[in-house]
Protein backbone atom coordinates (compact mmCIF):
# COMPACT_ATOMS: atom_id res chain seq x y z
CA UNK A 1 0.00 0.00 0.00
CA UNK A 2 1.20 3.52 -0.79
CA UNK A 3 1.02 6.66 1.30
CA UNK A 4 0.83 10.06 -0.39
CA UNK A 5 1.69 13.44 1.11
CA UNK A 6 1.19 16.81 -0.54
CA UNK A 7 3.03 19.96 0.52
CA UNK A 8 3.13 23.49 -0.88
CA UNK A 9 5.80 26.19 -0.78
CA UNK A 10 5.07 29.84 -1.50
CA UNK A 11 6.99 32.02 -3.91
CA UNK A 12 8.58 34.20 -1.20
CA UNK A 13 9.71 31.11 0.70
CA UNK A 14 11.27 29.65 -2.45
CA UNK A 15 13.00 32.94 -3.22
CA UNK A 16 14.41 33.13 0.29
CA UNK A 17 15.73 29.59 0.01
CA UNK A 18 17.27 30.35 -3.39
CA UNK A 19 19.04 33.43 -2.01
CA UNK A 20 20.47 31.35 0.83
CA UNK A 21 21.58 28.82 -1.76
CA UNK A 22 23.77 31.47 -3.41
CA UNK A 23 26.19 31.31 -0.48
CA UNK A 24 26.21 27.51 -0.62
CA UNK A 25 26.97 27.73 -4.35
CA UNK A 26 29.94 30.04 -3.75
CA UNK A 27 31.32 27.68 -1.11
CA UNK A 28 30.81 24.69 -3.42
CA UNK A 29 32.74 26.37 -6.23
CA UNK A 30 35.53 27.36 -3.84
CA UNK A 31 35.85 23.77 -2.56
CA UNK A 32 35.80 22.43 -6.14
CA UNK A 33 38.61 24.78 -7.19
CA UNK A 34 40.77 23.63 -4.29
CA UNK A 35 40.02 19.99 -5.06
CA UNK A 36 40.82 20.39 -8.76
CA UNK A 37 44.14 22.07 -8.00
CA UNK A 38 45.04 19.41 -5.43
CA UNK A 39 44.06 16.65 -7.85
CA UNK A 40 46.39 17.92 -10.57
CA UNK A 41 49.30 18.14 -8.14
CA UNK A 42 48.49 14.66 -6.81
CA UNK A 43 48.33 13.29 -10.34
CA UNK A 44 51.68 14.77 -11.36
CA UNK A 45 53.35 13.64 -8.13
CA UNK A 46 52.03 10.11 -8.64
CA UNK A 47 53.19 10.11 -12.25
CA UNK A 48 56.68 11.21 -11.17
CA UNK A 49 56.73 8.59 -8.42
CA UNK A 50 55.88 5.81 -10.88
CA UNK A 51 58.43 7.14 -13.36
CA UNK A 52 61.09 7.18 -10.63
CA UNK A 53 60.20 3.61 -9.67
CA UNK A 54 60.50 2.49 -13.30
CA UNK A 55 64.09 3.69 -13.46
CA UNK A 56 65.26 2.67 -9.99
CA UNK A 57 63.90 -0.80 -9.21
CA UNK A 58 65.91 -4.02 -9.17
CA UNK A 59 64.88 -7.64 -9.60
CA UNK A 60 65.31 -10.00 -6.65
CA UNK A 61 64.48 -13.62 -5.90
CA UNK A 62 61.39 -14.35 -3.84
CA UNK A 63 62.84 -17.41 -2.10
CA UNK A 64 65.78 -15.69 -0.41
CA UNK A 65 66.76 -12.42 1.24
CA UNK A 66 69.55 -10.72 -0.69
CA UNK A 67 71.54 -8.26 1.41
CA UNK A 68 72.64 -6.50 -1.78
CA UNK A 69 69.08 -5.26 -2.36
CA UNK A 70 68.48 -4.08 1.22
CA UNK A 71 66.75 -0.69 1.24
CA UNK A 72 66.17 -0.77 -2.51
CA UNK A 73 62.97 -0.88 -4.53
CA UNK A 74 62.64 -4.54 -5.54
CA UNK A 75 60.37 -6.60 -7.77
CA UNK A 76 59.55 -10.26 -7.13
CA UNK A 77 56.60 -12.60 -7.37
CA UNK A 78 55.44 -16.06 -6.37
CA UNK A 79 52.90 -17.98 -4.31
CA UNK A 80 51.80 -16.60 -0.96
CA UNK A 81 51.64 -18.92 2.06
CA UNK A 82 50.42 -18.91 5.65
CA UNK A 83 50.15 -21.40 8.51
CA UNK A 84 47.51 -19.36 10.32
CA UNK A 85 44.18 -21.07 10.98
CA UNK A 86 41.45 -18.46 10.62
CA UNK A 87 38.44 -18.92 12.90
CA UNK A 88 35.22 -16.94 13.14
CA UNK A 89 34.82 -16.20 16.84
CA UNK A 90 31.01 -16.38 16.84
CA UNK A 91 30.30 -19.41 14.67
CA UNK A 92 33.52 -21.41 14.92
CA UNK A 93 33.98 -21.57 11.14
CA UNK A 94 37.64 -22.34 10.37
CA UNK A 95 39.70 -22.24 7.18
CA UNK A 96 43.30 -23.12 6.37
CA UNK A 97 45.66 -21.79 3.71
CA UNK A 98 43.65 -18.60 3.44
CA UNK A 99 44.59 -14.94 3.59
CA UNK A 100 41.22 -13.85 4.99
CA UNK A 101 37.87 -15.20 6.18
CA UNK A 102 34.96 -12.90 5.44
CA UNK A 103 31.55 -12.97 7.12
CA UNK A 104 28.63 -11.07 5.58
CA UNK A 105 25.38 -10.58 7.49
CA UNK A 106 22.03 -9.57 5.98
CA UNK A 107 18.53 -9.28 7.40
CA UNK A 108 15.23 -9.47 5.54
CA UNK A 109 13.46 -6.18 6.28
CA UNK A 110 10.90 -3.66 5.15
CA UNK A 111 12.21 -0.82 2.97
CA UNK A 112 10.51 2.51 2.38
CA UNK A 113 10.75 3.82 -1.20
CA UNK A 114 10.23 7.55 -1.67
CA UNK A 115 9.15 9.16 -4.95
CA UNK A 116 8.71 12.93 -5.31
CA UNK A 117 7.17 15.04 -8.06
CA UNK A 118 7.00 18.84 -8.00
CA UNK A 119 4.63 21.03 -9.98
CA UNK A 120 5.02 24.76 -10.49
CA UNK A 121 1.96 26.91 -10.03
CA UNK A 122 1.04 30.31 -11.41
CA UNK A 123 2.35 32.95 -9.05
CA UNK A 124 5.62 31.13 -8.31
CA UNK A 125 4.51 28.61 -5.68
CA UNK A 126 5.14 24.87 -5.97
CA UNK A 127 3.20 21.77 -4.99
CA UNK A 128 5.20 18.66 -4.11
CA UNK A 129 3.58 15.23 -4.04
CA UNK A 130 5.54 12.55 -2.19
CA UNK A 131 4.55 8.90 -2.48
CA UNK A 132 5.90 6.28 -0.08
CA UNK A 133 5.74 2.61 -1.04
CA UNK A 134 7.00 -0.40 0.88
CA UNK A 135 8.80 -3.54 -0.19
CA UNK A 136 10.69 -6.36 1.48
CA UNK A 137 14.31 -7.14 0.79
CA UNK A 138 17.71 -8.11 2.17
CA UNK A 139 19.79 -5.36 3.79
CA UNK A 140 23.24 -5.46 5.38
CA UNK A 141 22.32 -3.03 8.16
CA UNK A 142 19.33 -2.25 10.34
CA UNK A 143 16.57 -0.21 8.73
CA UNK A 144 14.78 1.99 11.26
CA UNK A 145 11.08 1.40 10.63
CA UNK A 146 10.00 3.83 13.36
CA UNK A 147 10.52 6.68 10.88
CA UNK A 148 8.31 5.08 8.21
CA UNK A 149 5.32 7.15 7.14
CA UNK A 150 2.93 4.21 7.39
CA UNK A 151 2.60 1.89 10.37
CA UNK A 152 2.43 -1.87 10.04
CA UNK A 153 5.88 -2.26 8.48
CA UNK A 154 7.88 -3.09 11.59
CA UNK A 155 11.50 -4.22 11.41
CA UNK A 156 13.56 -5.83 14.18
CA UNK A 157 15.46 -3.35 16.33
CA UNK A 158 18.57 -5.50 16.78
CA UNK A 159 20.95 -7.31 14.47
CA UNK A 160 22.71 -9.99 16.55
CA UNK A 161 25.76 -10.26 14.30
CA UNK A 162 27.75 -7.89 12.13
CA UNK A 163 29.93 -8.38 9.09
CA UNK A 164 33.48 -9.22 10.10
CA UNK A 165 36.79 -10.06 8.44
CA UNK A 166 39.39 -12.32 10.01
CA UNK A 167 42.80 -11.91 8.38
CA UNK A 168 45.98 -13.94 8.47
CA UNK A 169 48.70 -12.14 10.42
CA UNK A 170 51.62 -14.25 9.21
CA UNK A 171 51.77 -14.29 5.43
CA UNK A 172 54.88 -14.92 3.38
CA UNK A 173 55.85 -14.84 -0.26
CA UNK A 174 58.94 -16.96 -0.46
CA UNK A 175 61.32 -15.62 2.19
CA UNK A 176 59.56 -12.27 2.41
CA UNK A 177 56.82 -11.29 4.87
CA UNK A 178 53.69 -9.68 3.44
CA UNK A 179 51.72 -7.28 5.70
CA UNK A 180 48.27 -8.60 6.57
CA UNK A 181 46.52 -5.46 5.33
CA UNK A 182 48.06 -6.02 1.89
CA UNK A 183 47.59 -9.79 1.78
CA UNK A 184 43.95 -9.88 2.90
CA UNK A 185 42.70 -8.40 -0.39
CA UNK A 186 44.72 -10.61 -2.71
CA UNK A 187 43.10 -13.23 -4.90
CA UNK A 188 39.44 -13.94 -5.51
CA UNK A 189 36.83 -14.71 -2.88
CA UNK A 190 35.55 -18.28 -2.67
CA UNK A 191 32.60 -19.73 -0.78
CA UNK A 192 33.40 -21.63 2.42
CA UNK A 193 31.73 -25.05 2.57
CA UNK A 194 30.17 -25.21 6.05
CA UNK A 195 29.93 -28.47 7.99
CA UNK A 196 26.88 -28.47 10.27
CA UNK A 197 28.54 -30.52 13.02
CA UNK A 198 31.50 -28.11 13.17
CA UNK A 199 29.56 -24.84 13.23
CA UNK A 200 28.23 -23.10 16.33
CA UNK A 201 24.91 -21.95 14.92
CA UNK A 202 21.55 -20.82 16.33
CA UNK A 203 19.17 -23.61 17.39
CA UNK A 204 16.80 -23.16 14.45
CA UNK A 205 19.43 -22.42 11.79
CA UNK A 206 19.55 -24.05 8.39
CA UNK A 207 23.14 -24.64 7.26
CA UNK A 208 23.57 -25.04 3.54
CA UNK A 209 26.61 -24.41 1.37
CA UNK A 210 28.33 -21.33 2.76
CA UNK A 211 25.18 -19.91 4.37
CA UNK A 212 23.55 -19.97 7.80
CA UNK A 213 19.87 -18.99 7.69
CA UNK A 214 17.49 -18.46 10.59
CA UNK A 215 14.67 -16.19 11.73
CA UNK A 216 15.25 -13.81 14.63
CA UNK A 217 11.74 -14.17 16.04
CA UNK A 218 11.48 -17.93 15.54
CA UNK A 219 14.91 -18.44 17.11
CA UNK A 220 13.68 -16.96 20.40
CA UNK A 221 10.77 -19.42 20.40
CA UNK A 222 13.08 -22.28 19.44
CA UNK A 223 15.40 -21.56 22.37
CA UNK A 224 12.47 -21.44 24.78
CA UNK A 225 11.10 -24.69 23.37
CA UNK A 226 14.51 -26.34 23.64
CA UNK A 227 14.90 -25.32 27.29
CA UNK A 228 11.45 -26.68 28.10
CA UNK A 229 12.19 -29.88 26.20
CA UNK A 230 15.52 -30.42 27.96
CA UNK A 231 13.99 -29.70 31.37
CA UNK A 232 11.21 -32.20 30.70
CA UNK A 233 13.64 -34.79 29.37
CA UNK A 234 15.95 -34.40 32.37
CA UNK A 235 13.00 -34.85 34.73
CA UNK A 236 11.91 -38.02 32.92
CA UNK A 237 15.43 -39.41 33.01
CA UNK A 238 15.73 -38.64 36.73
CA UNK A 239 12.42 -40.41 37.44
CA UNK A 240 13.47 -43.42 35.38
CA UNK A 241 16.82 -43.62 37.17
CA UNK A 242 15.11 -43.48 40.59
CA UNK A 243 12.69 -46.24 39.60
CA UNK A 244 15.53 -48.35 38.30
CA UNK A 245 17.48 -47.91 41.55
CA UNK A 246 14.49 -48.96 43.67
CA UNK A 247 13.83 -51.95 41.46
CA UNK A 248 17.44 -53.07 41.71
CA UNK A 249 17.20 -52.97 45.51
CA UNK A 250 14.39 -55.58 45.38
CA UNK A 251 15.88 -59.06 44.79
CA UNK A 252 12.97 -60.41 42.79
CA UNK A 253 12.78 -57.32 40.52
CA UNK A 254 14.05 -57.37 36.97
CA UNK A 255 16.53 -54.80 35.69
CA UNK A 256 14.89 -51.65 34.17
CA UNK A 257 16.97 -49.83 31.53
CA UNK A 258 17.67 -46.12 31.99
CA UNK A 259 16.01 -43.97 29.27
CA UNK A 260 18.26 -42.19 26.74
CA UNK A 261 17.88 -38.43 26.18
CA UNK A 262 16.01 -37.62 22.98
CA UNK A 263 17.33 -34.97 20.57
CA UNK A 264 15.45 -31.67 20.23
CA UNK A 265 14.07 -30.95 16.75
CA UNK A 266 13.76 -27.31 15.64
CA UNK A 267 12.29 -27.99 12.20
CA UNK A 268 9.05 -26.15 12.96
CA UNK A 269 11.03 -23.02 13.87
CA UNK A 270 13.24 -22.94 10.78
CA UNK A 271 13.21 -20.16 8.21
CA UNK A 272 12.26 -20.83 4.61
CA UNK A 273 14.79 -20.34 1.84
CA UNK A 274 12.05 -20.08 -0.79
CA UNK A 275 9.79 -17.71 1.15
CA UNK A 276 11.85 -15.37 3.36
CA UNK A 277 10.09 -13.48 6.14
CA UNK A 278 10.79 -10.28 8.06
CA UNK A 279 13.49 -11.05 10.63
CA UNK A 280 15.26 -13.73 8.58
CA UNK A 281 19.03 -13.48 9.00
CA UNK A 282 21.37 -14.72 6.28
CA UNK A 283 25.03 -15.19 7.19
CA UNK A 284 27.47 -16.12 4.43
CA UNK A 285 31.15 -17.03 4.65
CA UNK A 286 33.83 -16.51 2.02
CA UNK A 287 37.58 -16.84 2.02
CA UNK A 288 40.53 -15.57 0.03
CA UNK A 289 42.82 -18.60 -0.47
CA UNK A 290 46.57 -18.21 -0.85
CA UNK A 291 47.42 -17.18 -4.39
CA UNK A 292 50.13 -15.90 -6.68
CA UNK A 293 51.14 -12.31 -6.02
CA UNK A 294 53.60 -9.69 -7.25
CA UNK A 295 55.46 -7.15 -5.14
CA UNK A 296 57.21 -3.91 -6.05
CA UNK A 297 58.28 -2.30 -2.78
CA UNK A 298 61.30 -1.56 -0.62
CA UNK A 299 63.09 -4.52 0.95
CA UNK A 300 63.65 -4.05 4.67
CA UNK A 301 65.05 -7.28 6.02
CA UNK A 302 62.33 -9.90 5.62
CA UNK A 303 59.65 -7.23 5.39
CA UNK A 304 58.46 -5.01 2.56
CA UNK A 305 57.65 -1.33 3.08
CA UNK A 306 56.76 1.72 1.01
CA UNK A 307 59.75 3.10 -0.89
CA UNK A 308 60.22 6.86 -0.55
CA UNK A 309 60.88 8.82 -3.74
CA UNK A 310 61.37 12.58 -4.23
CA UNK A 311 57.67 12.96 -5.12
CA UNK A 312 55.97 10.33 -2.97
CA UNK A 313 55.94 6.70 -1.85
CA UNK A 314 55.75 3.64 -4.07
CA UNK A 315 54.29 0.38 -2.77
CA UNK A 316 52.46 -2.20 -4.86
CA UNK A 317 51.25 -5.68 -3.90
CA UNK A 318 49.05 -7.16 -6.62
CA UNK A 319 47.33 -10.43 -7.40
CA UNK A 320 48.95 -12.66 -10.03
CA UNK A 321 52.38 -13.14 -11.55
CA UNK A 322 53.19 -9.81 -13.15
CA UNK A 323 56.30 -8.28 -14.65
CA UNK A 324 57.51 -4.98 -13.25
CA UNK A 325 56.39 -3.25 -16.44
CA UNK A 326 52.87 -4.61 -15.97
CA UNK A 327 52.78 -3.35 -12.38
CA UNK A 328 53.86 0.14 -13.44
CA UNK A 329 51.32 0.18 -16.29
CA UNK A 330 48.52 -0.82 -13.89
CA UNK A 331 49.58 1.92 -11.45
CA UNK A 332 49.60 4.50 -14.27
CA UNK A 333 46.14 3.43 -15.44
CA UNK A 334 44.74 3.71 -11.92
CA UNK A 335 46.28 7.16 -11.51
CA UNK A 336 44.79 8.34 -14.81
CA UNK A 337 41.36 6.96 -13.92
CA UNK A 338 41.34 8.62 -10.51
CA UNK A 339 42.51 11.89 -12.05
CA UNK A 340 39.64 11.97 -14.55
CA UNK A 341 37.08 10.91 -11.95
CA UNK A 342 38.09 13.82 -9.70
CA UNK A 343 38.15 16.20 -12.66
CA UNK A 344 34.62 15.17 -13.53
CA UNK A 345 33.54 15.55 -9.92
CA UNK A 346 35.07 19.03 -9.75
CA UNK A 347 33.28 20.05 -12.95
CA UNK A 348 29.93 18.83 -11.61
CA UNK A 349 30.50 20.65 -8.31
CA UNK A 350 31.23 23.92 -10.11
CA UNK A 351 28.22 23.39 -12.39
CA UNK A 352 26.02 22.86 -9.36
CA UNK A 353 27.57 25.88 -7.65
CA UNK A 354 26.78 28.22 -10.53
CA UNK A 355 23.31 26.71 -10.76
CA UNK A 356 22.75 27.61 -7.10
CA UNK A 357 24.09 31.14 -7.64
CA UNK A 358 21.71 31.78 -10.55
CA UNK A 359 18.75 29.99 -8.96
CA UNK A 360 17.05 33.20 -7.74
CA UNK A 361 16.67 34.28 -11.38
CA UNK A 362 14.64 31.20 -12.30
CA UNK A 363 12.57 31.52 -9.12
CA UNK A 364 11.76 35.13 -10.01
CA UNK A 365 10.70 33.99 -13.48
CA UNK A 366 8.54 31.21 -12.02
CA UNK A 367 5.74 33.71 -11.44
CA UNK A 368 4.81 32.53 -14.94
CA UNK A 369 5.81 28.81 -14.94
CA UNK A 370 6.65 28.76 -18.67
CA UNK A 371 9.09 31.64 -18.28
CA UNK A 372 10.59 29.89 -15.25
CA UNK A 373 11.20 26.69 -17.24
CA UNK A 374 12.88 28.66 -20.02
CA UNK A 375 15.05 30.54 -17.52
CA UNK A 376 15.99 27.29 -15.76
CA UNK A 377 17.11 25.67 -19.03
CA UNK A 378 19.15 28.73 -19.96
CA UNK A 379 20.76 28.88 -16.53
CA UNK A 380 21.71 25.21 -16.76
CA UNK A 381 23.44 25.74 -20.12
CA UNK A 382 25.23 28.90 -18.97
CA UNK A 383 26.29 27.23 -15.70
CA UNK A 384 27.67 24.27 -17.65
CA UNK A 385 29.69 26.52 -19.95
CA UNK A 386 31.04 28.56 -17.04
CA UNK A 387 31.90 25.34 -15.18
CA UNK A 388 33.77 24.00 -18.20
CA UNK A 389 35.77 27.22 -18.60
CA UNK A 390 36.55 27.58 -14.89
CA UNK A 391 37.48 23.94 -14.30
CA UNK A 392 39.69 23.92 -17.41
CA UNK A 393 41.30 27.15 -16.26
CA UNK A 394 42.01 25.80 -12.78
CA UNK A 395 43.56 22.67 -14.28
CA UNK A 396 45.72 24.77 -16.62
CA UNK A 397 46.90 27.06 -13.81
CA UNK A 398 47.71 24.03 -11.66
CA UNK A 399 49.87 22.69 -14.48
CA UNK A 400 51.71 26.02 -14.61
CA UNK A 401 53.17 25.17 -11.21
CA UNK A 402 53.80 21.50 -12.04
CA UNK A 403 54.74 21.64 -15.73
CA UNK A 404 54.84 25.30 -16.91
CA UNK A 405 55.04 24.48 -20.63
CA UNK A 406 51.97 22.25 -20.52
CA UNK A 407 50.15 24.83 -18.41
CA UNK A 408 50.85 27.58 -20.95
CA UNK A 409 49.65 25.37 -23.81
CA UNK A 410 46.44 24.59 -21.94
CA UNK A 411 45.79 28.28 -21.27
CA UNK A 412 46.37 29.06 -24.96
CA UNK A 413 43.92 26.32 -25.94
CA UNK A 414 41.36 27.65 -23.47
CA UNK A 415 41.76 31.19 -24.79
CA UNK A 416 41.43 29.97 -28.38
CA UNK A 417 38.29 28.02 -27.51
CA UNK A 418 36.71 31.04 -25.79
CA UNK A 419 37.64 33.29 -28.73
CA UNK A 420 36.18 30.74 -31.16
CA UNK A 421 32.90 30.53 -29.25
CA UNK A 422 32.56 34.32 -29.08
CA UNK A 423 33.37 34.63 -32.80
CA UNK A 424 30.84 31.95 -33.69
CA UNK A 425 28.11 33.65 -31.64
CA UNK A 426 28.92 36.99 -33.29
CA UNK A 427 28.72 35.45 -36.78
CA UNK A 428 25.39 33.78 -36.01
CA UNK A 429 23.96 37.06 -34.77
CA UNK A 430 25.28 38.91 -37.83
CA UNK A 431 23.82 36.29 -40.16
CA UNK A 432 20.41 36.54 -38.48
CA UNK A 433 20.53 40.31 -38.73
CA UNK A 434 21.47 40.17 -42.43
CA UNK A 435 18.70 37.66 -43.17
CA UNK A 436 16.05 39.80 -41.51
CA UNK A 437 13.78 41.56 -44.08
CA UNK A 438 14.49 45.26 -44.51
CA UNK A 439 11.32 47.32 -43.99
CA UNK A 440 10.17 49.14 -47.16
CA UNK A 441 10.80 52.86 -47.23
CA UNK A 442 7.72 55.03 -46.94
CA UNK A 443 6.93 57.01 -50.13
CA UNK A 444 7.72 60.70 -49.97
CA UNK A 445 4.65 62.92 -49.65
CA UNK A 446 3.59 64.62 -52.88
CA UNK A 447 4.38 68.31 -53.04
CA UNK A 448 1.64 70.68 -54.18
CA UNK A 449 2.93 73.14 -56.79
CA UNK A 450 2.91 76.72 -55.71
CA UNK A 451 0.16 78.87 -57.13
Feature map (PLM): residue ranges:
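Hydrophobic alpha-helical transmembrane signal-anchor segments
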Residues: 13-42, 345
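Alpha-helical transmembrane signal-anchor/signal-peptide segments
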Residues: 40-63
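Alpha-helical transmembrane segments forming the membrane-embedded cores
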Residues: 7, 346, 353-451
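Short extracytoplasmic
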Residues: 55-91
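Low-complexity, intrinsically disordered extramembrane tails and loops of integral membrane proteins
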Residues: 1-11, 210, 235, 239-254, ...
